[in-house]
Amino acid sequence: MSGLRAQRLAARRAERRRAAGRGAMVAAACVVAAVGSITGMVSALDDDRGTDEARPQATRSPSLRPKPAVPSAPEPSPPPASPSSAAPSPSRTSSKPSPTPTATKTKETVAASARLYRYPDSQVLDWVADNPTDPRNEVIKSRIADHPAAVWFADYTPSDITARVSAVTSGGSGQGRVPVVVPYAIPDRDCGGASQGGAPDLDAYDAWIDRFAAGLGSEEVIVILEPDSIAQSDCLSSAERIDRFASLARAGRVLKEANPKARVYYDAGHSEWNAPDKQAALLGKAGAASAGSSDGVFSNVSNFNPTNAEVTYTRQVLDALDAPAGLGAVIDTSRNGNGAPADGEWCDPAGRKLGRPPTLSTGEARIDAYLWVKLPGESDGCKGAAGAFSPGYAYDLAR
């Protein structure tokens, strides 16, 4: 590693330590209680334990605890060479680990997501750079680190949010690629659960969204607006739900007015949560059916349900929403390559695999993109600290 590269990495880590010290808000946004025994995180290769220690990062993706789901049949990971092919039928025979990727497969997979932006400041990229001789390095690099993933903004810091969002969107526009950003600061998020946090009230949230929108720039960007904010709103009173949905509708308008090329998607939960008509009714109250505030819905964030189930579900939601013809859906495929675990486990469950690579060309009507919204390898809280990168977990997903 060159001296300049080492200096840059050291400076970036120092900035992360300063960011982590800004207070408990980030921790509250990202921490999920560890479940089960830490002894379950032994590396497949049983190498130096030090390389498995996770480093916290201020903008990592929080762990969203999914609603207990009916077990899903696993979905085979399709060949990366044909990401636009229709979702295959579920098959129980697909639970075998995927083979180690070849150089050809890596090249084809990267091409599938070429229009999406890979933000260069991430835990997985740091780990790959810091551990070049680790025997897991090539698999993690080629199958995870080389692919674009969403950038989360989970801490309520109004003073610098515009600059932080702009750093991502300007990086994407500079390369002619599309970044994916996730504002995650709605008050009372996670219904007081492990990922609770966010803005102190809706007035503060509205002001924060204004500043977030100011960083969107003028080129294409995808906004995954507040995961779980609609599907998981049962804990609110009727009046509180009305107020939240009004703020979400306002947020969509503000984001699209700030950047007309921004594509804003609203929370549809996932296929094993609310029924499509119930979810559509909630979405309609939050502005998701209006072309002035919405480009459609997203599903399966941080979850494991197979892509074909989510394709069917999101189309049903859009139909029930009576949405304008141009509205579509995006699906998180980051960890759904082997379907949901039979026991409903949500915290770093064993046997999960990477799903379809991120792409804006799905080959499916009304499905605008397959995205990696949850960053593969970032723990739910059982394989490592919640939201922190675990190379052992990443390797298990990727191999």
Locate predicted features:
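Hydrophobic faces of well-ordered beta-strands that scaffold small-molecule active sites
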Residues: 112-120, 126, 150-151, 179-181, ...
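Terminal targeting segments of Actinobacterial cell-envelope proteins
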Residues: 1-23
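Surface-exposed substrate-engagement region within the catalytic domains
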Residues: 126-140, 144, 258, 273-392
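N-terminal carbohydrate-binding/catalytic regions of secreted carbohydrate-active enzymes
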Residues: 109-211, 215, 375, 379, ...
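Surface-exposed cleft-lining segments at the edges of enzyme active sites
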Residues: 148-156, 195-200, 230-241, 265-272, ...
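N-terminal low-complexity, Pro/Thr-rich disordered segments
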Residues: 44-134, 194
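Substrate-binding cleft of extracellular glycoside hydrolase catalytic domains
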Residues: 167-264, 282, 293
